């Protein structure tokens, strides 16, 4: 019995150690560099932002990277996938990453040596709007995007957020004017993709506007640029000139096909954007549903498209050792709990103990907490940017494995404990079904399935609590002090 108690306790301790190890490993990824020369900003103001490697093209695709958010590593992975996907489309342009000085040096080397990007290091621009009442702190450093105007080595720059999914080559954008952007919102253009002509004059003027705190509704790059280019809505729609060597002058609105909001797809489950080429998908929604997170699919079907690009660009080799470690650990839990099934821990009490009712209530609470933890712990220790099929498989394996601990430790019936597991598996199948006519039918199907599952979850909860009470009443789990508990047929309670 002592050995079994030790085995069961060890399983939960190892689970907690995995969480600690995951947190430590992620922390190790974020060791910052030492602060570079404070005169760097002065040099940028005088000469513009220069890449350490000589420019190979006259135009560039650019994105930015900065530290200080809880999701730095995920955005680093997304940046690498964006770079590799552009490379795979054989774009006729350099790919530039505007990186803050505290981006880890190993990340910089990966971007330059493995991905072929040109990295420029910058000091973070001070955000004068961070004390606004509606300010979202995750956009604190998003004004670094303004550095794109200082990329004076290039004629045109297409500035990108990392949550863009490119479907085809978009080099025709370099023929656009001094500033071009897409109006996802009928009245407000989106800054996830825009075309600009680098200009130190414009860059200095933007910095001046930051100093005087130009009107900025959201305190981020979106609000600032919408305020700065307030007349863009009245400008003509961009049409690429037939001569691909001609660059237009002025400001233009870009067709919606260059920034297809993923939410449009979820309504019809297909693209139907007639104006302009369907070239780029953007994911401007909730941060926790960005396409690189394994749980984003099948909740949002397009997440699998992003992971398809990742699979053929940077792959998942960085996460796979940790995935395999977890899989082996979960299989070990199933084996250990199976071997420990015949005899389980028994607690003793005296009939006269005034705290008996409290002990029994606490015992039920602990049993339910173990079950709940079995479904929560695996979710948080799976590598967040792993492929969804691997992520969900590992989650289902982990939750089932950890569920066997309360099943065996508290002698619970199997079916009620794994009913949530079956419900989750069924939900995944309903959401992943490929033949829905549109997003409305899909949403109704998911809600209908959830509605049908709710009674089963409630019945399972009632069965678990009543089963625990019966076992307590029959003194299977709580034999009186001085008496031997039931040592045979523990599962035969009726």
Swiss-Prot record:
UniProt keyword Transmembrane present: yes
Swiss-Prot/TrEMBL keywords: Glycosyltransferase, Manganese, Membrane, Metal-binding, Transferase, Transmembrane, Transmembrane helix
Transmembrane stretches, start-end: 4-24, 316-336, 362-382, 389-409, 410-430, 444-464
Sequence similarity: Belongs to the glycosyltransferase 8 family. Glycogenin subfamily.
GO cellular component, one term: membrane
Membrane topology: Multi-pass membrane protein
GO MF annotation terms: glycosyltransferase activity; metal ion binding
EC top class named in words: transferase
Positions with a binding annotation for Mn(2+): 161, 163
Sites marked Important for catalytic activity: 145
Keyword Transferase: yes
Cofactor(s) this protein cannot do without: Mn(2+)
Localization annotation: Membrane
Predominant place of localization: membrane
Enzyme Commission number(s) of this protein: 2.4.1.-
Name of this protein: Putative glucuronosyltransferase PGSIP7
């Amino acid at each position: 019995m002592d050995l079994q108690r030790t085995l069961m306790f060890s399983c939960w301790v190892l689970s907690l150690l995995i969480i600690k190890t995951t947190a430590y490993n992620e922390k190790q990824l974020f060791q910052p560099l030492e602060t570079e020369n404070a005169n760097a900003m002065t040099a940028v103001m005088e000469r513009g932002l220069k890449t350490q490697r000589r420019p190979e093209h006259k135009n560039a695709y650019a994105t930015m990277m900065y530290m200080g958010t809880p999701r730095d590593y995920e955005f680093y992975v997304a940046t690498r996938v964006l770079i590799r996907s552009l490379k795979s489309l054989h774009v006729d342009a350099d790919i530039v990453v505007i990186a803050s000085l505290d981006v880890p040096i190993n990340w910089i080397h990966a971007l330059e040596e493995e991905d072929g990007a040109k990295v420029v290091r910058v000091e973070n621009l001070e955000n004068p709007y961070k004390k606004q009442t509606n300010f979202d702190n995750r956009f604190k450093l998003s004004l670094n995007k303004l550095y794109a105007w200082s990329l004076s080595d290039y004629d045109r720059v297409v500035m990108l957020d990392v949550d863009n999914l490119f479907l085809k080559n978009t080099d025709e954008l370099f023929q656009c004017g001094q500033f071009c952007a897409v109006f996802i919102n009928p009245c407000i253009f989106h800054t996830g993709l825009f075309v600009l002509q680098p200009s130190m004059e414009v860059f200095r003027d933007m910095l001046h506007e930051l100093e005087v705190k130009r009107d900025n509704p959201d305190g981020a790059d979106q609000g600032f640029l919408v305020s700065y280019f307030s007349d863009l809505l009245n400008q003509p729609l961009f049409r690429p000139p037939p001569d691909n060597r001609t660059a237009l002058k002025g400001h233009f609105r870009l067709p919606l096909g260059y920034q297809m909001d993923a939410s449009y797809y979820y309504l019809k489950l297909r693209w139907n954007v007639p104006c302009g080429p369907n070239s780029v998908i953007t994911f401007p929604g909730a941060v926790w549903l960005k396409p690189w997170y394994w749980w984003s699919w099948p909740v949002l079907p397009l997440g699998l498209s992003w992971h398809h690009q990742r699979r053929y660009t940077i792959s998942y080799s960085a996460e796979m050792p940790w995935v395999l470690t977890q899989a082996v650990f979960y299989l070990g839990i199933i084996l250990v709990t199976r071997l420990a099934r015949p005899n389980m821990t028994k607690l003793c009490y005296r009939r006269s103990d005034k705290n008996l009712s409290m002990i029994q209530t606490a015992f039920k609470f602990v049993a339910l907490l173990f079950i709940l933890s079995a479904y929560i712990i695996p979710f948080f220790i799976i590598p967040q940017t792993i492929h969804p099929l691997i992520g969900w498989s590992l989650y289902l394996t982990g939750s089932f494995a950890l569920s066997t601990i309360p099943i065996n430790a508290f002698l619970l019936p199997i079916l009620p404990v794994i009913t949530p597991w079956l419900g989750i598996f069924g939900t995944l199948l309903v959401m992943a079904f490929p033949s829905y006519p549109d997003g409305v039918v899909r949403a109704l199907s998911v809600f209908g399935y959830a509605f049908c599952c709710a009674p089963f979850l409630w019945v399972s909860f009632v069965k678990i609590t009543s089963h625990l009470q019966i076992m307590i009443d029959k003194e299977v789990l709580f034999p009186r002090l001085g008496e031997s508990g039931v040592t045979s047929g523990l599962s035969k309670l009726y």
